[in-house]
Each structure stands twice: as structure tokens, then as C-alpha cells.
Amino acid sequence: MHFLPEKLDDYVIAHSQKEPKLLQELSRETWQKVLAPRMLSGHFQGRVLSMISKLINPKNVLEIGTYTGYSALCLVEGIQTNGELHTIDTNEELYDFQRRYFNKSGYGNQIIQHIGNALDIIPTIDKTFDLVFIDADKKNYPNYLKIILPMLKSGSVILTDNVLWTGKVIEELQKGDKDTEALLKYNKMINENSQLETVLLPIRDGLTMTRVK
């Protein structure tokens, strides 16, 4: 989903930090070999994730939804030298693909991969997270929020992708559309929670930045 005319979109990208070569390589291989390559964060959003992480300088990062590892490599750019990034995905077939790029990045020892149901895995990680990125199955967004809130502290930031869902959030809800229904619920939850402050950014398919007060 694009909010700017194509020429303006190109201008924005041209005047933002260049995409690192490793991420260019990862993106190219994803498009060549992996199903649903549009799930990639992509150049501009990836640089946004990187910038936010660098501004926060987190010790512990949680990512829900790894895919091929692009966004994890963006988020880890701002991590502390003794920090960890825990990333969770259900697709075990992409594990080796992810690990190959994680090891190439120089952050391999700081990125910990988990395969399985995030709702089961998250409670087993004994960490307080400074930064969380949610980009997984939409129907569980409200559940992810509930389970991660106790693992955050004042100043922690939650980034959430696809919160505009190609515009479906402002259209009439279709019967049986559980993903859009869950996103509507999630967007309301984070906006109405008095312990959170939220801004919804019109980047790609909608990116929410939420800070714990």
C-alpha cells in the first residue's frame, strides 16, 4: 500500500539512508526463492526500523514474525553490545535461510531464533524488552499485546506492522474476516490504554509506534 505518488515515493527512498548490501542480497534471494516475498519490510521501512532501534539503543528486543530475517537485521543495528534479539516464527523451513544471513551480519551471536507458537514461546523468555516488533498473524495481535505488556517497562516501545491492512480498517467489515476484525480491536486497544501513548504512521501498510508511559 502506498500513500504517496510513485515519483514522490522514489524521492523519499532516494533521500533516505541507502539499503545495506547484505539486506539487498537478502531481499534479492527472498524474491527469487521464497513464497510471498511481499512480506519483506523493504528498503524504506527497514531504514525506519533501524533508525528507531538506534535511537532507543535497546538491550533486549523481541520480534514476533521473522520471515526471512530482513526486519530482524534492521532492528539489531541499534542493539547494545551485550544485548539480545529474540525472533519468533512458525516456519521452520526458513530457519537455515535466516541463520545464514544473521551470521553474515556480525550480529549472529546476538540473534536468537525460536520456532513455534509465539504465544507459547514468549512466556519462556525471561527478559524485560526495550523494543518489540509485531509482524505476524493478524488474528493474534490483541493476544500478543496482552502477553508482552507485563514484559515491558516505562519507555519500552512496541512497533506494529500492517495496522492499516491495505485500507480494510476503514471499510465495512466483511463477515468472517477475522484478520481485519482483530486489527480493529488491536488498534483500539493500544489507543485507549491509559498506560500507552501511540502514533500511527502511514508507512507502507501502516506502522504503529507505541510507548509505555
Residue ranges and their predicted role:
Residues 1-131, 138-159, 163-213:
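A short alpha-helical cap/connector motif
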